[in-house]
Amino acid sequence: MLKLKPAFALMLALPVIVGCSTNDNRYDPVDAPEIKNLFSLDEVWSSSTGGTGDFYSELTVAFDANNVYTASRDGDVMALTLDRGSKVWSVDLADEDENDERRSARVSGGVALGGGKIAVGSENGYVYVLNAKDGSILWKQYIEAEVIARPAFSASGDKLFVLDARGNFTAFNALDGSKLWVTGDAPQELRLRAQSNPLVVGDEYVLVGTSSGKVNVLLQSNGSTVNQVNVGESVGKTALERIADVSSSPLILGNVLYATSFSGGMVQYDLSTFNYIMRLGYQSSRDLGYDEHSILVTADDGTVSCINRADSSQRWANTSLGYRQVTAPVVFGNYAVVGDYEGYIYFLDMQDGSIDYMEQSDSSGISAQPKVQNGKLYVMAKDGSLNVYSYTDQARASAAVSVEQSNDMLAASAAAGLTLNHPGVYDGGIYAPSGVSQEALEQRRAAIIRAVAQQEAQIAAQRRAAEEAMRARAEYEKRRAAYEEERRERLSGFGIAQGIRSDLDEAEDTASESADTEYVEENNTEATTESTTNDSEDDNTKSSGFGIY
């Protein structure tokens, strides 16, 4: 479920409550579908990890070769073995001094894993980095703002990137917690509670969505913004209409960036040519699912859609889970798997979107995206139950592993060898570090302005061309309709009633009249001649030539 900032949410809620006498239930969740399961699912193991209770949170798990790492809202961070779910270690962050006067540690962003370390963020404004081997706290930093999004380590694990609720994006030295740089966009007046999880590309770039509807591409070295992809536009008369957050995580597959926004649809952007491939009308605030051939989108109304990567066509859309607070999807074998607010998990066939299996994993509900690791499905419930499943059908299990391996390869090769800097934008980007002179900063700013202007001009030209084509088409249809109407009016009397004459009849009559005229004129000439030579003839004889008698 989407949540807005509390103060604004309350302001928005008041008029809704006052005006609800009409019993409008358009946004009420539909009942869970009733289906006949086509296969069985085995529970491998289950463990309690603390959970998030009644609070909205997308806290999810992280994996390494041997363990799965979890965190709860209260501050319980633990490592469990992948094979049996046995506890390796656990740490309670609520025991830290800074949380003594708080209700709990209020962990809300995590879990991130990299370089033998794990990281989580809290609504209390703290970032914690722990040793993945034993859970010992390596360092912590207070950043004076809530951390909702999951932090991200660089590929080598030497940097940690954190997005806070104010829109600030901070890079830390992952070894000692020292701050390397800070950048960011000013937050919008009204925005979603959820935030985009940063996406790391090697040790050079990091991508993050913003509340202004953009995906920023930054250099890990100094935080400079070297490219910016417009996904949603913050337009409208009211703050509510202007919500355009990119709160889903950016996704890179090959050379293509995929991103969705709350109100602006989905964008496919070619990172090798810096051109927009396609804009599609799939609005979402949840992360995307994918495999080698497909992109999966969960809309905020509960619709789950499958898009063909090859041509961006829609393969299917399942609308049977309307407003059930459906999670982000994940591909597991031949299925797209999602959860909902009542704790059901659904297996949607990747070919046609039909639900082939459903089960209530936990009655407390599911808000975090399910995860797949080593051919097994990991489902985290709101009460902290971590349930792990596998297929009974070995063929399906093999398919699940195959898809997982393929996805790992896609993720590992994301943007490999690409330069993500927009043409004309170099290391300085838009936001330069403090060591850069004002003159150099202005030069870089001018370069980015020119690049953006060129891009906007190209988009505007394309838009004008499309509008002109639409106007020409409309004019053509208007003229065609007028012609057809005129033609129908001209032809409406053919053979229907006497006295209605066609164009052919008129032409024949005209020809006949012309012939008669010539005949009359000829006779008149003869009559005149005859009259001249026979003036003395009888009047009755002359009159007889005119057809009177």
Please give the residue ranges for each predicted region.
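C-terminal motif of bacterial Sec signal peptides marking the signal peptidase cleavage site
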Residues: 18-19
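Extracytoplasmic beta-rich repeat domains
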Residues: 24-30, 35-62, 87-112, 139-156, ...
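Structural signature of WD-repeat beta-propellers
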Residues: 72, 122-123, 164-165, 210-211, ...
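Short loop/turn segments that connect beta-strands within beta-propeller blades
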Residues: 81-84, 131-134, 173-176, 220-223, ...
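Loop/turn-rich, solvent-exposed surfaces of beta-rich toroidal or solenoidal domains
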Residues: 298-306, 313-347
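Long, low-complexity, compositionally biased polyampholytic IDRs enriched for Lys/Glu and Gln/Arg
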Residues: 438-492
